[in-house]
């Protein structure tokens, strides 16, 4: 039994290929995969936007130092709207660097400047892709350019004046029909005899005066309106005149009753004080001065 135990002793101390040391030192073994490479360093910051000899800046560069560099690449999706000539007669084309160059000049006075869409940075390798939001933006830009180009030649100058003067003028009224003196005289005679005409009478009168039925009807309507107004004015004038006459008669009667002479009392004739009191009328408007009374001593 001892030799068997001695034979197993060295077998237990034999190194194991999958132990902790072998697992921790796995890369050192043959056939193990190499470690992944370290990540590349970040790219350097982009240079400032270049300027042309005429002082025109490139729109594709960053504005105000904002981190929006214009990446070089094709613009097949948004290059078509800018190649068309705008209302100023300038072709907006993309530069090889992927930016839009605008010449430094002032717009034509009176023209409507079209809105300049914001430049969309292109991603290398994705120039042929199309997204829904890109389609809507492209369609919106094209519609705006088309509308601006269509409205520019037909610019209407606004009138200076009151706002209501810009409205559509009212419809011109029909000129007033004029009749001859003979026609007016015959119409007046017939109106004084008869204020209202039947259809047959109106037709006969129109035929005799060489007028239309509508003209005779309109004339009689206007004449009746004038007659009613004149009659009302005459009645009002008569009523006012009658009122003034009644007031005048009442005033005269009242004054006559006040101015009637009073029969003097025989007793007052011998007494000057009583005579003065009898002749005193304080209700008169124009009272005469009372002479001084001398008392009899």
UniProtKB/Swiss-Prot annotation:
Identify the Gene3D superfamilies for this entry.
Homeodomain-like
Residue spans binding DNA: 172-231
Keyword check for DNA-binding, yes or no: yes
Kindly list the places in or outside the cell where this protein is found, as annotated in its UniProt entry.
Answer: Nucleus
Kindly state one GO CC term assigned in the UniProt record: nucleoplasm
Bias-annotated ranges (Pro residues): 32-52
Q: Does the keyword rRNA-binding apply?
A: no
Q: A Pfam family matched by this chain, by name?
A: Homeodomain
Q: Where is this region: Disordered?
A: 1-68
> Tell me, which GO biological process terms does this entry list?
animal organ development; central nervous system development; GABAergic neuron differentiation; negative regulation of neuron differentiation; neuron fate specification; neuron migration; regulation of respiratory gaseous exchange by nervous system process; regulation of transcription by RNA polymerase II
The alphabetized UniProt keywords are:
Developmental protein, DNA-binding, Homeobox, Nucleus
Question: Which Gene Ontology MF annotations are present?
Answer: DNA-binding transcription factor activity, RNA polymerase II-specific; sequence-specific double-stranded DNA binding
**SUPFAM superfamilies, per this entry?**
Formin homology 2 domain (FH2 domain) (SSF101447), Homeodomain-like (SSF46689)
Tissue note: Expression is restricted to neurons in the peripheral and central nervous system.
The protein's matches in InterPro entries, at most eight in alphabetical order, are given as: HD, HD_metazoa, Homeobox_CS, Homeodomain-like_sf, TLX1/2/3
The protein's role, per its UniProt record: Seems to be involved in the development of cranial sensory innervation from peripheral ganglia.
The identity of this protein, by name, is: T-cell leukemia homeobox protein 3
Q: Which organism is it from?
A: Gallus gallus
């Amino acid at each position: 039994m001892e030799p068997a135990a001695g034979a197993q002793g060295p077998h237990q101390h034999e190194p194991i290929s999958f132990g902790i040391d072998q697992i921790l030192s796995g890369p050192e073994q043959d056939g193990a995969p190499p470690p992944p490479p370290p990540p590349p360093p970040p790219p350097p910051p982009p240079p400032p936007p270049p300027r042309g000899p005429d002082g025109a800046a490139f729109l594709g560069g960053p504005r105000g130092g904002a981190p929006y560099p214009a990446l070089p690449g094709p613009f097949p999706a948004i290059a078509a709207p800018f190649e068309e000539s705008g209302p100023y007669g300038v072709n907006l084309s993309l530069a090889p660097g992927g930016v839009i160059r605008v010449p430094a000049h002032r717009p034509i006075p009176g023209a409507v400047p079209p809105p300049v869409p914001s430049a969309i940075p292109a991603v290398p390798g994705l120039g042929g892709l199309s997204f829904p939001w890109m389609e809507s933006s492209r369609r919106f830009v094209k519609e705006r350019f088309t509308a601006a180009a269509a409205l520019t030649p037909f610019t209407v100058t606004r009138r200076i004046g009151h706002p209501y003067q810009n409205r559509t003028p009212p419809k011109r009224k029909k000129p007033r029909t004029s009749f001859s003196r003979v026609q007016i005289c015959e119409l007046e005679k017939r109106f004084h005899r008869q204020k209202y005409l039947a259809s047959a009478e109106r037709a006969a009168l129109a035929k005799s005066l060489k007028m239309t039925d509508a003209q005779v009807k309109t004339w009689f309507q206007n004449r009746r309106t004038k007659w009613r107004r004149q009659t009302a004015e005459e009645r009002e004038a008569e009523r006012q005149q009658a009122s003034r006459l009644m007031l005048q008669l009442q005033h005269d009667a009242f004054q006559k009753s006040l101015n009637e002479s009073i029969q003097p009392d025989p007793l007052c004739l011998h007494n000057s004080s009583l005579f003065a009191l009898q002749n005193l009328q304080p209700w008169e408007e124009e009272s005469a001065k009372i002479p001084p009374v001398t008392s009899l001593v």
